[in-house]
């Protein structure tokens, strides 16, 4: 039996808003508010693009990431609760998530 890749909600959420180019508001722990589109992320940082400029934001400085539109990461018809519903499309081409 093939073992499915382990996913965490942070990576699934960030990958979803990155792929859909959903505008986000990022609140930092010091209260600063940043807005833009997440273009890339890894275990330690996020690239945020706005008005043609890119900012490198370290994850330890982030308090909250709030998308401009609602994000659905799981199938609400499931009774399992907080199970993340991943498709092959969600994982395709994202070596950092496998």
From Swiss-Prot:
Q: Recite the UniProt keywords alphabetically.
A: RNA-binding, Stress response
The text of the family note is: Belongs to the Hfq family.
Which residue ranges does the record assign to the Sm domain? 11-71
Q: Does the keyword Aminoacyl-tRNA synthetase apply?
A: no
Protein's GO biological process = regulation of DNA-templated transcription; regulation of RNA stability; regulation of translation, ncRNA-mediated
> How would you summarize the oligomeric state and partners of this protein?
Homohexamer.
Q: Which domain of life does this protein belong to?
A: Bacteria
Q: What is this protein called?
A: RNA-binding protein Hfq
> So what does this one do?
RNA chaperone that binds small regulatory RNA (sRNAs) and mRNAs to facilitate mRNA translational regulation in response to envelope stress, environmental stress and changes in metabolite concentrations. Also binds with high specificity to tRNAs.
A single GO molecular function term of this UniProt record: RNA binding
What InterPro entries would the database entry show? Hfq, LSM_dom_sf, Sm
Q: Name one GO cellular component term.
A: cytosol
Its organism's taxonomic lineage begins at: Bacteria, Pseudomonadati, Pseudomonadota, Alphaproteobacteria, Acetobacterales
């Amino acid at each position: 039996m093939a073992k499915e890749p382990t996913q965490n909600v942070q990576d699934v959420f960030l990958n979803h808003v990155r792929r859909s180019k959903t505008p986000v508001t990022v609140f930092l722990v010091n209260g600063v508010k940043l807005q833009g589109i997440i273009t890339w992320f890894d275990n330690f940082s996020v690239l945020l693009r706005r008005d043609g400029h890119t900012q490198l934001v370290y994850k330890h400085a982030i308090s909250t990431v709030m998308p401009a539109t609602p994000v659905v990461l799981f199938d609400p018809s499931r009774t399992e609760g907080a199970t993340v519903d991943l498709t092959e499309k969600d994982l395709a081409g994202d070596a950092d998530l496998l």
